[in-house]
UniProtKB/Swiss-Prot annotation:
Molecular-function GO terms, alphabetical: acetyl-CoA carboxylase activity; ATP binding; carboxyl- or carbamoyltransferase activity
Primary site of residence: cytoplasm
Function: Component of the acetyl coenzyme A carboxylase (ACC) complex. First, biotin carboxylase catalyzes the carboxylation of biotin on its carrier protein (BCCP) and then the CO(2) group is transferred by the carboxyltransferase to acetyl-CoA to form malonyl-CoA.
Name of the featured protein: Acetyl-coenzyme A carboxylase carboxyl transferase subunit alpha
Places the protein is found: Cytoplasm
Length: 311
């Protein structure tokens, strides 16, 4: 059963009317209602607030990394474990094919349903997850395979065990190694990009965001609690933080915005996956036209140009 957000209620009513008309075989009414639906979708989704985009990024039905991996990849083989401590289920690593390209894919996975959410730790990786990701990235480098990273996490896990196993070092190590990785790399924020947990697989030649994804140094809830001592002011915090794909593109913090379906990736997973696949393959083609030195130099300039200052 589809889940509708508060601002999608008119869409829900029209879609229910369409189903009712289809049951009655009233083709004329179905056609009319579908036109009304297209108009309502355009009206709502072309005027979304940052807070509404945050709700879409966190939508319970939004495709996760594993959904995209299953839709995009074939002949795939999963890579397990960091060879130091354990296998972290919050990070997925696969080698396989996207189209005719042999690739390595790394993704952060939130999980669906209570048992799976617990297994995936709600998409919050431990240090061993980031070390597994680095192991997969190094395999891509060793065999000269392109790397695709799918970012979707509220943040790195802040528990005692994670800190004892040096969470900050694992993230910092990934930032260093991925910035110097000698193969083509593309990172895409598919849902939530939360702080260092997102950055740990976000350093790449190309960094893109899905239309309704978000990327921030802290959650809006955390920001509102710190600034106003009131978690209820999350909407104000969201508006002020500039966390949407449009804001971040304007600030030159990302390279591209991937046009997921206007109504949201959760309503049309196949089209959303196809958009990621097309973006990956087209950007990979561009990266391969560069010399290795040119590509590494461009990556370095991009990473060192992040931020702004005034004297």
């Amino acid at each position: 059963m589809a889940t509708y957000l508060d601002f999608e209620q008119k869409i829900k009513i029209i879609q229910e009317d369409i189903i009712s008309a289809q049951v009655r075989h009233d083709d004329g009414l179905v056609a009319s209602l579908k036109k009304n639906l297209d108009k309502e979708v355009s009206k709502i989704f072309t005027n979304l607030s940052p807070f509404q985009q945050l709700q879409l990024a966190r939508h319970v039905d939004r495709p996760y990394a594993l959904d995209y991996i299953n839709l995009l990849m074939r002949d795939k083989y999963e890579i397990h474990g960091d060879r130091h401590f354990r296998d972290d289920a919050a990070i997925l690593c696969y080698i396989g094919y996207i189209g005719e390209e042999k690739v390595v894919v790394i993704g952060e996975q939130k999980g669906r349903g209570t048992k799976n959410k617990i297994k995936r730790n709600f998409g919050m990786p431990h240090p061993e997850g980031y070390r597994k990701a680095l192991r997969a990235a190094k395999l891509a480098e060793k065999f000269n395979l392109p790397l695709l990273m799918l970012v979707d996490t509220p943040g790195a896990y802040p528990g005692i065990g994670a800190e004892e196993r040096n969470q900050s070092e694992a993230i910092a190590r990934n930032l260093l190694e991925l910035s110097q990785l000698n193969t083509q790399s593309i990172s895409v924020v598919i849902g939530e990009g939360g702080s260092g947990g997102a950055l740990a697989i976000g350093v790449a030649d190309r960094f893109a965001m899905m239309r309704y994804s978000v990327f921030s140094v802290i959650s809006p809830e955390g920001c509102s609690a710190i600034l106003w001592n009131d978690p209820a002011k999350v909407e104000s915090a969201t508006n002020a933080m500039k966390i949407t794909s449009g804001d971040l593109k304007e600030l030159n913090l990302i390279d591209d915005i991937i046009a997921e379906p206007l109504i949201g990736a959760h309503r049309d997973r196949d089209s959303a996956a196809a958009a990621i696949g097309e973006y990956f393959l087209s950007e990979l083609k561009k990266l391969r036209q560069m010399s290795n030195e040119q590509r590494m130099e461009e990556r370095y300039k991009k990473l060192t140009s992040v931020g702004a200052f005034s004297e």
